[in-house]
Amino acid sequence: MVSIAFYGGIPGGISTPITQQSEKSKCEENTMFQPYCYNNDSKNSMAESKEARDQEMNLKEESKEEKRRNDWWKIGMFLLCLAGTTGGILWWYEGLPQQHYIGLVAIGGRLNGSGQSNAIECWGSFPGCRPFQNYFSYETNRSMHMDNNTATLLEAYHREITFIYKSSCTDSDHCQEYQCKKVNLNSSASSNSVRVEDVTNTAEYWGFKWLECNQTENFKTILVPENEMVNINDTDTWIPKGCNETWARVKRCPIDILYGIHPIRLCVQPPFFLVQEKGIADTSRIGNCGPTIFLGVLEDNKGVVRGDYTACNVRRLNINRKDYTGIYQVPIFYTCTFTNITSCNSKPIISVIMYETNQVQYLLCNNNNSNNYNCVVQSFGVIGQAHLELPRPNKRIRNQSFNQYNCSINNKTELETWKLVKTSGVTPLPISSEANTGLIRHKRDFGISAIVAAIVAATAIAASATMSYVALTEVNKIMEVQNHTFEVENSTLNGMDLIERQIKILYAMILQTHADVQLLKERQQVEETFNLIGCIERTHVFCHTGHPWNMSWGHLNESTQWDDWVSKMEDLNQEILTTLHGARNNLAQSMITFNTPDSIAQFGKDLWSHIGNWIPGLGASIIKYIVMFLLIYLLLTSSPKILRALWKVTSGAGSSGSRYLKKKFHHKHASREDTWDQAQHNIHLAGVTGGSGDKYYKQKYSRNDWNGESEEYNRRPKSWVKSIEAFGESYISEKTKGEISQPGAAINEHKNGSGGNNPHQGSLDLEIRSEGGNIYDCCIKAQEGTLAIPCCGFPLWLFWGLVIIVGRIAGYGLRGLAVIIRICIRGLNLIFEIIRKMLDYIGRALNPGTSHVSMPQYV
């Protein structure tokens, strides 16, 4: 039976003949391209099965993927151990003890880590001076010390009680002359009644001699101990003790208190009275600025007690006096038991501050035996949350508005132990400091910046080579730069110290100017009030300092102080300019030395500088270490995959280019041949068995002898075969045969591992796969996600991949929008359905189908 061959077109491939065979031959049904079929079971088909190739490739990919998974598991465990070690080192580093914050030690701050609620805490305002609300605490190795010019409030109070210091001013409301007479207080042993008798020679009662004082109006009479008053020229005129020393209206505050580390004039109202409270574990707390304070006389001997039944008990006595008009103010009597009282001047009378939950009282106590004291509450002045009690009726304070304070201060040990992390800028402690070794690198915590720090730390491995280059080439230059840098640092530190001193003076000048403005406003208000109503009221502003009175302050005045400030500012300006000029010169020389054209070395310096500055910012937070580990793990595990993908892309682009050039060369060579006629081409295809005539290629690359021709063709004469061989040799050159036949033979060799096939089978197979991999097929594979190596060129692959990614993103967005619209439509339909049913139900209820309502009938 004669075989009839005709051409069928394969999209994208060469024209392949399809032959009609005998009925006995059965074609295999598992092949995609099958130009010939055979009835010999021992022979395989010529064309390669695509399914077999896909299965083989899938097996290879699964094997590689399994091996890759095992490798990455090992690498992941190694990175886990590495990150754990790094995290442990950083955790240890963060746990090292750091320097303390002592830049601002002020009442109004909170000590971090203190067992007490508020180590240093005050709330309040100052009428004459305005505190600075914002401070920047800094970490340094400066030492805190005290000298003759600076003293902390804790030292000034000696953990017991503050002094009410002298102020050369004598203008105060209660510091006025009183008309007093001596009286005796007599009581019977069986009653609590006490009689007041006018006598010349007085006797002690309750440990004190007594005076009955009033003013010219005789509107108010006060019964006070003689120890609270001072006689004037042996007459019946008395004034309260200490009027020229305490309770003075401030006209000029001594410059002896430090605001932070800056000396200023600080005026407060009212003065602070700090007392000591014994706590557990031998800790002391100095506190109390808020409760009502009965202002009184402070003797040299001082003590502090807590008002409870174990220390002091009130003695209720009835004072009997002859008839009087107006107000008669009597004292409050206490009996107290004190232990471990040491007198400073061997006097029996001491001043005691007794503080309770809601008030503080000043007591004058007289020792009647070893531990028992008779005490009386002092009469003059009530200061604190209440008001100043004025003796005369025409001197009243209207609309009283006084400051309230709530303070507590820990002992000095906690100030040196804990970090001050919060300040409110109310009243500072005077602390002086000096630099010992210079600047200290700050440990920072930037929160989200720790993520950046982890990424920078991960790049340190790559930077090691760069820094090796820097170390080899830049040693001398770096040493020279360091020398200039040290000079710049020293000059900068000196300049900072000078600027700090200048700022101290500047603060004092600013606050003094502010105080002057306040005084001018006050005077203006007083004059306006006087012009309107013809009388004025006195103000009560107290000057409180943290240092005993120095007689040299009496020679100070505003003019001399301003002259001194201006002179110091000019001197400091000159020193600062000189110092900064030297620092600028050293810095310029350092920059010139460091300005190198070696960009690699400069990059290494910058990189390691950033790494050194950012790594400490991780902080001692376990969350940040976890984030750092995850980022490092992700970066290191993804880098090989990314590099492998880039290598595939690069090699794929090279392979695509090579195949493209080979195909162009083949077509160019083939175009030079003469045009074939249809008969010659049919003869060539029929005699493809010996087309090459090269026994070397048949033995090395062919898997089996070519037996694809029909039985009728096998019976044809040998001369026809020889002519066909000659024609094949004249068409296919040696170079073309070598380039085309070897890939096909390699594929056959991979299938069965044995040679013997005709090399034209491999050539035909390559042509089918190469021509079938056109742009259309490549794009289809890329869209399906099965494209491993680009077969249509690297630029086109990138462009098509971008188009696919954009298309998928747009598709996801549109699908999400469709889902949202569908949900909204369902929700609206549900709402409309509910409304429809409600309206239908109401309508049916109002308009039933059958009415059961009977209309009334009128007969």
UniProtKB/Swiss-Prot annotation:
Membrane-spanning segments: 615-635
Post-translational modification: Specific enzymatic cleavages in vivo yield mature proteins. Envelope glycoproteins are synthesized as an inactive precursor that is N-glycosylated and processed likely by host cell furin or by a furin-like protease in the Golgi to yield the mature SU and TM proteins. The cleavage site between SU and TM requires the minimal sequence [KR]-X-[KR]-R.
GO molecular function: structural molecule activity
Extracellular face of the membrane: 7-614
One cellular-component annotation, GO: host cell plasma membrane
Keyword tags: Cleavage on pair of basic residues, Coiled coil, Disulfide bond, Glycoprotein, Host cell membrane, Host membrane, Host-virus interaction, Membrane, Transmembrane, Transmembrane helix, Viral attachment to host cell, Viral envelope protein, Virion, Virus entry into host cell
Propeptide positions: 1-6
Record topological domains on the Cytoplasmic side: 636-859
Single GO biological process annotation from the record: symbiont entry into host cell
Protein name, as recorded: Envelope glycoprotein
Source taxonomy: Viruses, Riboviria, Pararnavirae, Artverviricota, Revtraviricetes
